[in-house]
């Protein structure tokens, strides 16, 4: 019988990556609604509530490390009393874009650029989102450049269809098992969801 779980993510792209990661985990989850999607600060302010709610219903949470030192210290900062066993909190180092970049050869083909331009260790990138956008500037495909790269004079940090274009890549091309070879934080996340044992009504 599928294990019912709800999701929590920072944004729409994070949600799609998390859903696809779970779909590829080999586990039979019954995925419910995704909460959050209002940014990292909102997630941080409410993570305690999700941890309390996990007593009655399992949650899988994805957040970005951003500029914090390391995932364990961030988790201790957010949940100083620890995570409930029904709450799986995983941290992308340093942003979810590093997990996308980790499927390097396929992402290079998607952009139409040499594979050698994609970082081999995206978790080591200071700003993987900026790195991804700069790679997209070199794309041979005009539509991809227009979707991912901010338009000249725009005040936005991303292109007009950034989330939509990358969601399409994740759903149609990205494979977690391949990508986790280049991203330790993704590998840890995959193992965590493969081994979690949510229990309804557990206190």
Labelled PLM ranges:
Residues 1-4, 15-33, 44-60, 65-203:
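C-terminal accessory helical subdomains adjacent to catalytic cores in phosphodiester-
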Residues 35-39:
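Conserved helicase motor
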């Amino acid at each position: 019988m599928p294990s019912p779980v709800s999701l929590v993510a920072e944004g729409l792209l994070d949600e799609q990556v998390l859903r696809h990661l779970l779909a590829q985990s080999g586990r039979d989850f019954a995925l419910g609604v995704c909460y959050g999607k209002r940014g990292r600060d909102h997630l941080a302010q409410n993570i305690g509530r999700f941890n309390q709610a996990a007593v009655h219903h399992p949650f899988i949470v994805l957040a970005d490390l951003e500029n914090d030192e390391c995932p364990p210290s961030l988790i201790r900062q957010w949940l100083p009393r620890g995570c409930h066993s029904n709450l799986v909190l995983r941290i992308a180092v340093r942003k979810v874009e590093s997990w996308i970049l980790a499927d390097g050869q396929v992402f290079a083909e998607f952009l139409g650029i040499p594979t050698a331009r994609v970082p081999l260790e995206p978790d080591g990138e200071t700003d993987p989102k900026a790195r991804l956008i700069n790679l997209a500037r070199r794309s041979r495909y005009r539509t991809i450049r227009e979707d991912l790269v901010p338009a000249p004079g725009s005040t936005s940090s991303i292109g007009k269809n950034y989330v939509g274009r990358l969601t399409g890549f994740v759903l149609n091309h990205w494979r977690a098992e391949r990508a986790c070879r280049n991203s330790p934080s993704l590998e840890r996340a995959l193992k965590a969801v493969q081994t979690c044992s949510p229990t309804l009504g557990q206190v």
